[in-house]
Each structure stands twice: as C-alpha cells, then as structure tokens.
Amino acid sequence: MSKEKFERTKPHVNVGTIGHVDHGKTTLTAAITTVLSKHFGGAARAFDQIDNAPEEKARGITINTSHVEYDTETRHYAHVDCPGHADYVKNMITGAAQMDGAILVVAATDGPMPQTREHILLGRQVGVPYIIVFLNKCDMVDDEELLELVEMEVRELLSQYDFPGDDTPIVRGSALQALNGVPEWEEKILELAHHLDTYIPEPERAIDKPFLLPIEDVFSISGRGTVVTGRVERGIIKSGEEVEIVGIKETTKTTVTGVEMFRKLLDEGRAGENVGALLRGTKREEIERGQVLAKPGTITPHTDFESEVYVLSKEEGGRHTPFFKGYRPQFYFRTTDVTGTIELPEGVEMVMPGDNIKMTVSLIHPIAMDEGLRFAIREGGRTVGAGVVAKIIK
C-alpha cells in the first residue's frame, strides 16, 4: 500500500462539499478520507482537523477553507470544505478553489434548505460543471417514502438551475456512521467514490486548451520588432504560429516569430510559463497591456455581461458604505482595469459591504472573455469586490 503514495501518474481532480449549514459537509469530508484511506491508502483526517479551517487570502479576501486529499483506485482528489456559508460564497466567486465537481450534502431529516438552493445557484453561476448528491443522516429516517420525497425535491431543485436533476447520482448514506466504522455505511462512501470516479469526467489540463496569453508588457526591440510579455494562461505557443490580439481595440492577426524566456530563445512557451513573444509587423503603439494573444477564433471581446459578485466587508478592507445603481468602479480583468457601470436586479436598491449579488456590467472597452472568467472590482487601485462572468450579453 505504501508504494501507492508516490504514484503521481493518477489524474488529479478538484472537488468540494457544498450544502446547507449542519447538514454534515465536514463530517462527510472526514468520513471520505477515513474510509478511502483504509481501502486505497492516504491519510485519514479527523473532523476537528478539518473544522478549524485555516484562513487564506484570495484576491485580498479572507476565506476559511480546509483542503484534504484522498485517492481512489483510479484518481487523486483534492477536496475543499468550508466552515461557514460566507466562506462558500467567497470561495466559489473568487475561484480560490476551482471545482471540477461538487458533492452536495443534503440531510434527509431536513430536505433541501435555503443554502442548499443558494449553493446550487452559485454552482450554476460560477461554472461548477457537475454535482453529485450525498443524502446524509439516512440512518435517522426509517420511512422509505420520506427518503424518496427528499430525493425528488433535490432532483427538482437541480433541474431548476439547469443541472441534469433526473440523471444526477444520489447516494443515501450516513457520514457519522461511516466515520464510526459501521460497514453498511462505509459501503455508501465507497459508492460515492465510485460516482466521483465515473460521473465527473477527467478535467482538461490547461496545457491542452487553446493558447491564451494575457499581455502584461510591451517593448520594442530595435531591429527585431515588438515583444509582448506575460504568463501563458493556457495552451502552447510555438514560433511561426499565427495569433490574434484580442480586447480593447479591433481584433487583429499577427505571427509569433520567436518565443523567449529569461532572454533565451525557446521552441515553444507552455501554460504556466512567463515568456516574451516577438510579433511580426506589429507596432509598439498598436498593442497594450490588458489585451490577450490567443489562438485565432478561440476567444472574443465583450463589454456587457451578467455576473455574480461578492462585495468585500469593511473588515476585509472593502467599502464602509453601500453602493447604488449607476455605480462606476473599475473592473480588473487579468492584467488591467476597465471602467464599467452596473445594473442591479429588480427590486434591489443598494448593495452593502459583505453582500453577494447578481449584477449586469457594461464596460467602456471590450475585454477578451469567456463565461467563468474571474475579475476584481476596484476603486482607485483598492479591491472592493470579486466577481465571475456568469453569462455574456454582448
């Protein structure tokens, strides 16, 4: 068994528990690590080790999150669990812990509750692609019909937010009994693990996606032309390939005639690397920070979108006062700030620090964007909010 730990060949998948307060998310997290460590190696984590989650900072926002890891026969999982509802909201909006899939925990004794709905909605808005349901505390419900009713309610709720409710795997279990080592309930954790392995597809790695490089700096090198620098966000760029320059201005095409790193010429630049790309025939003044280089036809510039936003509280260094419709802050995408105006949902007059809210944004310049792109909201260089593009309008 001990040899298992050093195998880095298994695909890596990011998951997390979501759901209403006290429905058993943390107990389930502990149960998964405990049961799977018996079967596939790895470390068991006790409830209280997970529950006192350390504080982290993501984009200046304080979030309490616990990270655990576990293995199944075919995969390695990184799993996040948050103690408080506000932590989930912040986590999902900032993308601090990107999830390839989520385990929605619903207590069979209660059925779906307000945060159950809110977490499903957030999952939809921020692009959590797959949800598996763990119906918890089933040891406390004798009535088969009641279980079926709760299951039906959960499926309806998922369908309401465009998840495939009818096809979603639902496991009936008891996290506490599994944690206590009761075999019939341990079996349910293995069933959950099986669904994780089969229902959540292996995520596409950044390197396999189409090339994208957010431009941080632009230089002109006499006799050679214009060089842009930045960190490759996804994909690979090779010398000789055609790229588009997208955002802020009209989209144009150019050819990359050289890729360098630390002043050395490379054959290619790969996701995660900081590179300089030499562009053929592009003038220094035609290109600026905030644009992106991308594989032609893979990303388009937009100004108007629907977003899900978390507004920092005063304690987090955010605003001390609410804002109203017509608010005009800067929206920081990748490497640059763009001014934009906001529209609030009908019936919402103002937004308080610490709130999360759905808002429609209209930028003064187009930015290269996809649904799921994260941004910060800033006033004079200070971050006052974090958001994610939920739906592109134009």
Curated annotation (Swiss-Prot):
Residues covered by region (G5): 174-176
Catalytic activity: GTP + H2O = GDP + phosphate + H(+)
GO molecular function, one term: guanosine tetraphosphate binding
Domain tr-type G residue range list: 10-204
Binding site for Mg(2+): T26
Binding positions (GTP): 19-26, 81-85, 136-139
Keywords assigned: Cytoplasm, Elongation factor, GTP-binding, Hydrolase, Magnesium, Metal-binding, Nucleotide-binding, Protein biosynthesis
One cellular-component annotation, GO: cytosol
InterPro entries: EF-Tu_GTP-bd, EF-Tu_GTPase, EFTu-like_2, EFTU_2, G_TR_CS, P-loop_NTPase, Small_GTP-bd, T_Tr_GTP-bd_dom
Main location: cytoplasm
EC number: 3.6.5.3
Renumbered residue ranges of the record's region G2: 60-64
Region G4, annotated ranges: 136-139
G1 as annotated region, ranges: 19-26
Enzyme class, spelled out: hydrolase
UniProt xrefs under PROSITE patterns: G_TR_1 (PS00301), G_TR_2 (PS51722)
Protein location: Cytoplasm
Xref: Pfam families: GTP_EFTU, GTP_EFTU_D2, GTP_EFTU_D3
Chain segments carrying region G3: 81-84
HAMAP family from the UniProt entry: EF_Tu_B
Record's subunit section: Monomer.
Entry similarity comment: Belongs to the TRAFAC class translation factor GTPase superfamily. Classic translation factor GTPase family. EF-Tu/EF-1A subfamily.
Protein function: GTP hydrolase that promotes the GTP-dependent binding of aminoacyl-tRNA to the A-site of ribosomes during protein biosynthesis.
Entries under PANTHER family matching the protein: ELONGATION FACTOR TU, MITOCHONDRIAL, ELONGATION FACTOR TU-RELATED
Name the UniProt record assigns to this protein: Elongation factor Tu
Natural source organism: Actinobacillus pleuropneumoniae serotype 5b (strain L20)
Source lineage: Bacteria, Pseudomonadati, Pseudomonadota, Gammaproteobacteria, Pasteurellales
